[in-house]
Amino acid sequence: MLFPTEFDVIVVGGGHAGTEAALASARMGNTTLLLTHNIETLGQMSCNPSIGGIGKGHLVKEVDALGGAMAAATDEGGIQFRILNSSKGPAVRATRAQADRLLYKQAIRHRLENQPNLWLFQQAVDDLMVEGDRVVGAVTQVGIRFRARAVVLTAGTFLDGKIHVGLNNYTGGRAGDPAAVSLSARLKELKLPQGRLKTGTPPRIDGRTIDFSQLEEQPGDLDPVPVFSFLGRVEQHPRQVPCWVTHTNERTHDIIRGGLDRSPMYTGVIEGVGPRYCPSIEDKIHRFASKESHQIFLEPEGLTTNEFYPNGISTSLPFDVQLELVRSMRGLEHAHILRPGYAIEYDYFDPRGLKASLETKVINGLFFAGQINGTTGYEEAAAQGLLAGINAGLFVQGKEAWCPRRDQAYLGVLVDDLVTRGVSEPYRMFTSRAEYRLSLREDNADMRLTEIGRELGVVDDIRWDAFSRKRDAVSRETERLRTTWVNPKTLPADEATPLLGKPIDHEYSLADLLRRPGVSYDGVCGLRAGACAAPEALAEDDVLLAQIKEQIEIGIKYQGYIDRQAGEIERNEAHESTRLPEGVDYAEVRGLSFEARQKLTQFRPETIGQASRISGITPAAISLLMVHLKRGLGRRPTKPAEPGADNKPVTQ
């Protein structure tokens, strides 16, 4: 049957990508339908019970700056918060939180059920409705046909998913959920470039059988307790609890080696490539054979359960080997496993078949987000979902897509890496992937993106008001520090020396003093018995005040480096903003090598900047392209070749 209501946007899948996509589209005023195989699993944390980390926390802050739900839900469900790399520079500091699975899921569902313009419907999707080169809807497993002007597909690990425990395997999207076999087959018929990846999860342990007296306690940050959202408050956090640390040992490693003959990874049963930066314990003892021990973190799954997640022993070994290896570690000698660990193999689609908007190049109005694009991690999925939801909304409104640049957001780095370089293994975000990371910090994600989000329609009045107050306070106070001066007469040696280490010998602005190593904003404001402080409070609450102080201090201390990076960004702007028309015939570009012509024709980059990041495209090739552009590009008389004509990703 045809469902009586036609929607602007349909989102398929209710994981971290799907929920952010649906919320973003609906916030923009588009009638949006979220189709999920099970409403009870909306926002479910399928693997580790944590959000954030190095690079990942930056993405969460960016999602939050654009009005997304992940950071706010983490503040409501987070049971331990830490700032990683707190002793290092601001570019690599990152927030990480342990989350109560149930509280997090409840927070996400509450937002979905109370979002205007958003409808939920429980049915698995088996097919897409495609007319010509455009998607027009989706078909569920019982034949209900939903029509829409755009579709966002966020299928996670469900596409033809296969779960492995030892040499036993069965179809599934994750433990307890069916795989999307029909939908995967349908996508392959559409000639989208496809491949196979693998990920895994560890066994879960009953906390009542753990001897915590044998373990090292790892508490969260308590003074102050961090918050994730720019609008977050410590009072939103539930009760805070510690994690615990144990280690593998030689006996553990011997047990694992003894079970490799029954490992699906080492017997050729699993063909998909696993994540390099979240390897299974089998991979660890093989790749790091000389290492005698690996650190294992026991992470609580929630406040109302005894279940613990042993971070670091993801495995697909047979259950008897899993039980033996768990019990070989200190504190786990009598551990009871509640759920076995497993590996899951699933289809993904080569992201080089996508535009920078995450719309597929071969089917108009069809957007992909999350693990379907070859990424791994909740945060990477949420960021892609947000962008796909925004661009699906812009698509149905007849507006130009928003494609964040590499110098603008980690989201821009993530998408640019995917659509220009593709993936040969599950992609994970790190700060090292961003060449402009000093400008892309967690603390300034709102300064970079909230104004853009307001223009796009995804930032509400409450967030906009809070941001405006923060932005104005930072601007005013920074200017005051730069224009307020002290000299040896107004700042005597006995006042200057305790803060600065020596007296001042001539006139300085307060900003000059703050720029010195070891000098804090509060320290400068405390000079002259507090006479150097701002004449009025910068903010009414402590969290916003801390954010303002951090912005001011970083902006002044790192101004020289930030200005230098801004100059580099400006020099590269010409390449990033120079678009390549869709009909470019690269065979007509004089001097291009055969390899360059082949790759440019296959991947169809949208800008000169994207072209420069394709493997095998040299600076000389870019120069030839620029010359060709100035002459006036020849165009192909026919439609560009489908990037996935052979239905397989091309290895770079």
From Swiss-Prot:
Protein name: tRNA uridine 5-carboxymethylaminomethyl modification enzyme MnmG
Lineage start: Bacteria, Pseudomonadati, Pseudomonadota, Betaproteobacteria, Burkholderiales
Main location as per UniProt: cytoplasm
Cofactor: FAD
UniProt xrefs under SUPFAM superfamilies: FAD/NAD(P)-binding domain
Organism: Paraburkholderia phytofirmans (strain DSM 17436 / LMG 22146 / PsJN)
Gene designation per UniProt: mnmG
Gene Ontology CC: cytosol
Highest taxon above the source species: Bacteria
UniProt xrefs under InterPro entries: FAD/NAD-bd_sf, GIDA_C_N, MnmG, MnmG-rel, MnmG-rel_CS, MnmG_C, MnmG_C_subdom, MnmG_C_subdom_sf
Family per record: Belongs to the MnmG family.
Keyword Iron-sulfur: no
